[in-house]
Design a protein with these regions (language model features):
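Intrinsically disordered, low-complexity regulatory segments of eukaryotic
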Residues: 2-172
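Positively charged alpha-helical interaction cores common to chromatin-/nucleic-acid-associated regulators
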Residues: 144-209
Length: 209
């Protein structure tokens, strides 16, 4: 779940990364700064998927309640209904532990909206097997929409390739805005060698990413 100055997105990784308390700190700060209105904190659904995010109950008054941290309706809940079944890969997600990281990455943070890749038929994601056949990227929902335009020329890409250790890469995008289609192609191009030539598995370091 991320905020922007104009709307609230629906994604639950913030709660998974920071835990309920730090997530509520972020939400509280965003509300107090006037960057998110309470009428935006309603259940939101990602079109074409079964993912629904719930943040604050609609009966919350305009003034920020002191009970925000104890409300039974946690403001960072995520409901995922796996209607079609499928594998679930457990992941160990990085959490900011130091006071400086919590201040810089939570209290003072202003996250950008998450970027979803919804393919043909409303399926969430694009398979690697079809990544370099241009048809899947042509059928991406909103493929021509701009994604990154933050004045940055590169982004960090963190990859969990089960059961190997987590890998981190720097992906250079240039200084122009990048469309969702171009971003998908760049990500797959960067990962191509990793998928086709995975590292040897060291049993001593086998872990959940």
């Amino acid at each position: 779940m991320c905020f922007s100055s104009d709307r609230l997105a629906t994604e639950g990784s913030l709660s998974l990364m920071w835990g309920p308390r730090l997530s509520e700190v972020y939400i509280t700060n965003s509300l107090l700064k006037g960057q998110v209105a309470l009428d935006q904190l309603q259940p939101k659904e990602i079109p074409g998927t079964s993912i629904v995010g719930y943040y604050l109950p609609p009966e919350v008054p305009d003034s920020l309640p002191s009970s925000i941290a104890t409300n039974p309706h946690r403001p960072v809940d995520l409901v995922v209904d796996l209607k079609e079944g499928g594998p679930i890969i457990p992941q160990e997600i990085w959490t900011p532990h130091t006071s400086k990281n919590q201040q810089d990455l939570v209290a003072d943070a202003m996250l950008h909206l998450p970027i979803y890749f919804i393919g043909d038929g409303g399926k969430l994601g694009v398979s690697y097997a079809h990544a370099f056949n241009k048809a899947p990227t042509r059928t991406l929902d909103g493929g021509e929409e701009e994604t990154f335009d933050f004045g940055k020329s590169s982004v960090e890409l963190r990859v969990c390739l089960w059961p190997y250790k987590r890998k981190e890469f720097t992906m250079y995008l240039g200084k122009k805005s990048v469309t969702r289609r171009t971003l998908a192609q760049k990500v797959f191009a960067r990962l191509k060698d990793l998928f086709e030539n995975p590292p040897e598995l060291d049993i001593m370091h086998k872990k959940v990413c």
